[in-house]
C-alpha cells in the first residue's frame, strides 16, 4: 500500500515538474476524445437530414430515370440518353402493364432565368404533370395548381415558389401577372406555400409549368428527363417497380442478360445507399480522430514511464 502511494506521489511530482509536457499530452487526449464525439455527432446529424429529405417524397414514390444505373463517373453519360418518351409513359400508365401504379408525372428540367418588368430571378424550373404537387406533398398558398386539361392544351401558365414571388413581385399579388421565360410570356396561376427544402429541392425557388408546354415551347424536345411515379400503397411499391421494369424491358426489346437503358430509384434503395455511404464515412473519420487519441495516450504512457 505504501509503495503504491509512493509511486503516485512520485508520478504527480513528475507531472508537476513537467507542466508543459503534461498539459500538451492531456490536450492530445481531450482533442482526440472530442474529435470522435464531434465526428460521430456530425455524421449522425447529416444522416438524419438526408434521410428526412428522402422520406419527404413519400414511401410509395419512386423515380424512373434514363440510362443504366451509374456505378461510377464513367457511367454518368448514360443518364442523358433519350430512353423515356411518350410511348414509355403510355406503357407505364396502362393498368394492364402496371396495375398497382396510382399517379405518374413526367419531368423535364428547364434551364434559365425568369423575369417580370425590371426584376430577374434564377429559379429551379421543371416541366411537370398535374400530379407532381401531390407527389411532392406540397400545398398551394395562393391561386391554384394547373390541371390535366392545362397539360393537354399546353397552357402557358406557371406555379411559383414564395422566394420567386418575393423576388419578382415584392409584396404585390403575383396571381394573374405574366412572367417572361426564354422570350415567352407565362401567366402565374398559383404560389406554393413556404416550404423550404424537400426531397433535395428548395421548393421556395421552384417554377413549375406543364411538361407539354415546356417540351413544345421552351425545349423543343420529345423525351423526359425522368418520370416520377407513386404506387397505390407502400406494400405494392416493389411489385409496381418490377412491373415497370418488365414493361420497359419488353418495350425496348432488351434480352435477358443485357443491361437496362433505364434505372429506377425508390426510397428504400436510396436509404440503403445513404446508410452504406455514411457508415463508411463514419468509420473513416472516427479512425482519423482515433489516431489523435492514440498519440495522446502513448504520450501519457511515456510520461508515466519516465516518472
How should these model regions be labeled?
Residues 44-124, 167, 215-216, 239:
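Hydrophobic, regular-secondary-structure patches
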Residues 20-48, 296:
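Short, strongly hydrophobic transmembrane alpha-helices
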Residues 1-31:
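N-terminal Sec/SRP start-transfer signal
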Residues 12, 23-30, 179, 284-290, ...:
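Hydrophobic residues within alpha-helical transmembrane segments
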Residues 30, 39, 226-230, 263:
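Short aromatic/hydrophobic contact patches that present stacked aromatics
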Amino acid at each position: 500500500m505504501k509503495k503504491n502511494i509512493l509511486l503516485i506521489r512520485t508520478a504527480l511530482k513528475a507531472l508537476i515538474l513537467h507542466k508543459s509536457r503534461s498539459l500538451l499530452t492531456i490536450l492530445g487526449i481531450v482533442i482526440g476524445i472530442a474529435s470522435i464525439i464531434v465526428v460521430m455527432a456530425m455524421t449522425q446529424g447529416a444522416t438524419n437530414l438526408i434521410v428526412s429529405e428522402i422520406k419527404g417524397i413519400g414511401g410509395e414514390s419512386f423515380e424512373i430515370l434514363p440510362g443504366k444505373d451509374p456505378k461510377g463517373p464513367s457511367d454518368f453519360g448514360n443518364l442523358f440518353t433519350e430512353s423515356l418518351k411518350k410511348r414509355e409513359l403510355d406503357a407505364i400508365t396502362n393498368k394492364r402493364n402496371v396495375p398497382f401504379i396510382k399517379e405518374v408525372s413526367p419531368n423535364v428540367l428547364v434551364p434559365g432565368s425568369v423575369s417580370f418588368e425590371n426584376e430577374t430571378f434564377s429559379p429551379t424550373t421543371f416541366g411537370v404533370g398535374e400530379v407532381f404537387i401531390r407527389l411532392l406533398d406540397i400545398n398551394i398558398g395562393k391561386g391554384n395548381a394547373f390541371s390535366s386539361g392545362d397539360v393537354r392544351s399546353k397552357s402557358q401558365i406557371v406555379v411559383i415558389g414564395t422566394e420567386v414571388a418575393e423576388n419578382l413581385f415584392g409584396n404585390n399579388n403575383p396571381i394573374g401577372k405574366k412572367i417572361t421565360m426564354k422570350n415567352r410570356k407565362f401567366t402565374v396561376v398559383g404560389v406554393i406555400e413556404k416550404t423550404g427544402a424537400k426531397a433535395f429541392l428548395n421548393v421556395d425557388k421552384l417554377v413549375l409549368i406543364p411538361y407539354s408546354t415546356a417540351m413544345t415551347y421552351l425545349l423543343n424536345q420529345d423525351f423526359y428527363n425522368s418520370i416520377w411515379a407513386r404506387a397505390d400503397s407502400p406494400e405494392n411499391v416493389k411489385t409496381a417497380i418490377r412491373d415497370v421494369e418488365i414493361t420497359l424491358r419488353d418495350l425496348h426489346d432488351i434480352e435477358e442478360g443485357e443491361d437496362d437503358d433505364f434505372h429506377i430509384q425508390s426510397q428504400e434503395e436510396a436509404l440503403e445507399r445513404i446508410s452504406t455511404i455514411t457508415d463508411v464515412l463514419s468509420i473513416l473519420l472516427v479512425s482519423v480522430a482515433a489516431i489523435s487519441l492514440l498519440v495522446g495516450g502513448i504520450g501519457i504512457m511515456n510520461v508515466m514511464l519516465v516518472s
